[in-house]
Amino acid sequence: IKRFDRDQIKTNNQLKTILNEFNKGEIDILVGTQMLSKGHDYHNVRLAVVLGIDSILNMNSYKAREKALSLLIQISGRSGRKGEGEVIIQTKNEGFFNHYLNESNYKEFLESELEFRQELYPPFLKMAKVTFSHANGIKIKDEMDYFVKLLKDNKNIEVVGFGQSPIFKMANKYRYEILLRSSNIKAL
């Protein structure tokens, strides 16, 4: 059993070594992050198990459904390339994944995504995220609030949301963000 993530694999040589060991059968099980799904060549994968896909599906992003489904399609493509393969998915959204994966309805998914995005999201409207970061949490929040007020007065820009970033503190700095939308890229 080997870990396959960015904490464990820091160089291209480490990556090649683990892939070679796995492809030779010296490693039976790889446990890792999304990094496992990214374009690496694995032989003889007969089982892929996906845990926590709902955290991607439930992200606060208009791209969440697309990211989750795309990741599962990538992972599914790893299993059974040379022979039989199986994919087990842990999810509370079985209907969504069954419909678009088992019934090969990816084209239908793309059409429904375009329809969903048509009124509010790219590629039909433009979006931007402004991130504020500073060691002084009060100062940076006040700065974000100041810009929110300015931006709300701009008739060409809609302030979709603002507040603490999902990862509120990083590298000893507090983080806030503003999400903006406009039909005019220059306004953003």
Task: State each model region's role.
Residues 1-3, 11-62, 74-188:
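Accessory helical-bundle/CTD segments and flexible terminal tails appended to RecA-like ATPase motors
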Residues 62-69:
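Short, conserved loop/turn and helix-capping segments at secondary-structure boundaries
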